[in-house]
Amino acid sequence: MKNLQSKNNKSKNYELFLRKSAHIKSRQWWQKYLFKIRRLLYRYLPNQKLSLFKNASFTLLITDNKEIQDLNKRFRKQDSPTDVLSFPLIKNEQQNKRYLGDIVISHQKAKHQATNEKKSIEHELLLLFIHGYLHLLGYDHKTQKQEKLMFSLQNKILEKINVRN
């Protein structure tokens, strides 16, 4: 893939891809917060979700509106850019390890939303990552009950990270 910086970090159970056009935060910045978020998820997830989380890996792609719109159209039949997409996958029985799936974030959408909501880009990027990760763990917001549960956990983790708002 052209214009892509990748880092496979097996010890941290993730693969991080930053499009050069979307490189608004450094790899080190992402690594620091991915570690913190996963640690907080481990602390706050209910027991039935912890089994999904242990020994699990994922891929994170930070890209632009064009690419996320293409993905949104292809997989969700919606021809518009979105802020975050999650693609949950299933357990790999042979490796006794779970690959949770992929999270794709549009840096342009994140920047636009941060500006509109008068929040920092850092806050918005981490909010989108947490939101996408919770989808990989099976959380959703199709009903009010689901939304309350998911957003409560999302906000608790975001608050504990203590990123500039």
Regions found by a protein language model. Give the residues of each.
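An acidic/histidine-cluster motif and surrounding catalytic segment
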Residues: M1-L126, L136-N165
